[in-house]
Regions:
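Short, well-ordered coil/turn elements that cap or connect secondary structure elements
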Residues: 35, 61-63, 84, 121-123, ...
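Residue-level signal for inorganic ion chemistry
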Residues: 27, 58, 90, 131, ...
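Catalytic phosphate/metal-binding cores of nucleic-acid and nucleotide-processing enzymes, i.e., regions
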Residues: 5-9, 85
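Conserved P-loop
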Residues: 9, 13-81
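Short, well-ordered beta-strand core segments
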Residues: 38, 89, 164-167
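Helix-adjacent hinge/juxtasegments
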Residues: 64-110
């Protein structure tokens, strides 16, 4: 079997999708297909047994060769530190990062601005994964509504800064924005 040729990634790719939509698997395939050193920047925290098990399963599913960095709060700096000309960074996921920021009482909008600003100067490609949470009904609880509002604004900000934006549903990617323009 022939080894596929590396596929060049644009500087910034944003991948959105629902829970269990296949967005992370798609992002991993893009990063591995780049031929660069894959870096997995995880934002999840093992705050309960179910999340600890989920993190363990994710680690086992990834092929060997991934460098894993865990950073639940200081994502802009972690992305900048992990990026390199010979590396492709996958950030999974932005909505968990937002949750961490909200629960820590951080300024979510400022953190989103900081992340967006860091993306322009990275020496290698980054693939950002996030849950699209704005497709359902307006949540009843104030914290849930605040979270959905922050996620929507962050996604819009990052989509504007990204070279490629994809939406994944049922494992199928749909380009919302392709390198060089809109689709």
């Amino acid at each position: 079997m022939e080894t596929p040729l590396p596929q060049e990634l644009p500087p910034v790719t944003l991948i959105l999708g629902g829970a269990r939509s296949g967005k992370t698997a798609h992002a991993e395939a893009l990063v591995l297909g780049s031929g660069l050193q894959p870096v997995y920047l995880a934002t999840a925290q093992a705050l309960d047994a179910e999340m600890a098990e989920r993190i363990r399963r994710h680690r086992l599913q990834r092929a060997q060769g991934w460098l894993t960095v865990e950073e639940p709060l200081e994502l802009p700096h972690a992305v900048a530190d992990a990026a390199g000309a010979n590396r492709s960074v996958l950030v999974d996921c932005l909505t968990l990062w937002l949750t961490n920021l909200l629960l820590a009482g951080r300024d979510v909008e400022a953190a989103g601005d900081q992340l967006s600003a860091h993306l322009a100067d990275l020496p290698g490609p980054v693939v950002l994964v996030s849950n699209e949470v704005g497709l359902g009904v307006v949540p009843m609880g104030e914290l849930s509504r605040t979270f959905v509002d922050h996620a929507g604004r962050l996604h819009q900000r990052l989509a504007a800064a990204a070279d490629r934006v994809r939406f994944v549903a049922a494992g199928l990617p749909l380009d919302l924005k392709a390198p060089g323009g809109r689709r």
